[in-house]
């Protein structure tokens, strides 16, 4: 591999993996990109003949004996730990981006932590969640005892919970919180072999609460926030944009962090030593904690629950 060009590996080329890939593929910078998927023939057929500035390689199994500046794992959650373990055993990786939901077994979190300790060359582990990023973009500062509601659009309830917990965690400044439920039931996810829920959830801390409401009629998510001074409404991913209203007046519009646009820029910024330390690149520790909180909650409600 050319040492002057960043080497990227993407494992799992479903919708999210493809979005990550296209972020690099559409860049004006040149990259060495390895793509790995069980259905790699279809992907290879689509991209091999297209003219581009990148070096592309296609693999059905995880490649070995390579040095990667970045590896993105966008497989299903059930197989993610096994794939990461094999990847790090046979390759040198500087940075990892992991899709959510991280792992579906509590033991895999502790096992992965052991791997991290024996793999000191990993400088960044990022989990692709957008709650923290979006809230920081808004610049919202709330007084204590706020009340919030999160209205889901026609997207999955459980599958978006990690994003919402990430957002709430930022609102309450990393304080601990409870996940409470009201008449929730398990239903089948649109993704085969995984679960979803219907009902209502609430996140509760000492200084605020957030009610999560399934509103399938809406085409986008809506966050409503109230404290003693102001009210805020945030439309999320409304035609790839976020619109923030303060006391019913539009005050800010910014891009929703779509992987197709965001990933390559995110990686480039993470390498820049001058970028503010407040930018949440290495968020694995926090998202791992939130993921386990969510997983334990569902395990307490249902005999078996598999998150995607």
Question: What is each residue range found by the language model?
Answer:
Residues 20, 50-97, 101-113:
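Beta-loop-alpha module in the N-terminal Rossmann-like domain of NAD(P)-dependent dehydrogenases
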Residues 62, 70-73, 95-98, 102-158, ...:
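A contiguous active-site-proximal alpha/beta segment in oxidoreductase catalytic domains
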Residues 1, 30, 70-73, 268-308:
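C-terminal helix-rich "cap/oligomerization" subdomain common to oxidoreductases
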Residues 189, 194-196, 207-269, 278-280:
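NAD(P)-dinucleotide binding in Rossmann-like oxidoreductases
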Residues 40-46, 105-108, 134, 220:
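Short, charged/polar "capping" segments at the starts of alpha-helices
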Residues 149-220, 285:
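Rossmann-like dinucleotide-binding domain that binds NAD(P)(H)
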Residues 14-16, 76-79, 102-103, 129-133, ...:
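Short beta->alpha connector loops
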Residues 1-50:
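N-terminal Rossmann-like dinucleotide-binding module
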